[in-house]
Amino acid sequence: MLFISRSLLPILYFQLFKKMSPFRLLSLPTLALKNVLLHIDFIDLLELSLASKKCEIYMKTCCLKIDSLHFHFRRIQLNSKSKSLEFDFNSVVDISACSRKVKGSRYDAWTKNYDESRIICIPTNFDEDIIAVFQHFWDLFQIKNLHYDVVGFTGVFLNNTMARLPSKLKSLEFGDYLSGNQDNIDTILNYYDISDNLKVFDEVSKIHEKMKKVNNLSLICLPSIPIEELIQLDCETIKLYWKENSAINAVRSLISNWKGNKTRLEHLEILASEDWNFDLVLEGMNAKPWNPRRRPSNYQKEDLNIDCTSYMDIEGDCQIASIGIRENRYLDFIVWF
């Protein structure tokens, strides 16, 4: 049996690989090229795609799949199961760094951080350049889910960007912090088709049709929303920030609607502007204390873990739901499936 000292291994590897001839990456068959590209991090994939038009075309033929792209107004994030990339337009940069061009747009101070999987740069024309980066990623990869977050920049987004992006989304967050511009809200929701998460950081005075069927909905509500519109919501999770004292009426109406109809509601959370009068909320509901034989002690979903041992239980159409107060301000209504 032959034993090789560990100290000799590097020498043997060197002797082996120095005899191998270099090869052209793009000469590989498509499947082999794809397997190589899958093991390259996003920063180098981006650099490779910008090396030449030929590189970009060959990469497109590999149909590389990406789990999600998050479009924020000052950065773009790519995510897959094993790697990620943040493309940042808003951080301090090394102004001595080189420039790059993406689809005709120039980016100065192009700085790569491999430890954080991040590229930082200065766009020369912001509105055009962020679209160019997005479009490059959109063309280069097969992206499963799109997420847009333009909170605080909604007006600019509406005027310059919205109609130039794909309209079918997994999640959308927008709003200009209580500007109360219902026309902007309607315009954005008329354009986009949102499947999963919708968060509106603005004063909402009516329920838009697109709000009714998303899986998870978060709204800042005004008391002018008619109850008849509110009970049309059929979402799994509903989070409302209620600006006035009519929150109790909204809660009771939503619970009454749940008791009388089959809905998808799993968790209703309402943050009121004042402390809750819990007795008034429960009035006439025949609520009972927690019975550990009938439902769990905690509600857990994703990063949420709510202790429901002190919550009161009510029944409706062969289901049990719990209702309780957190931190004096948050009212939870949780349906157990």
Curated annotation (Swiss-Prot):
Domain of life: Eukaryota
Stretches assigned to the F-box domain: 22-76
Designated name of the protein: Uncharacterized protein F54H12.5
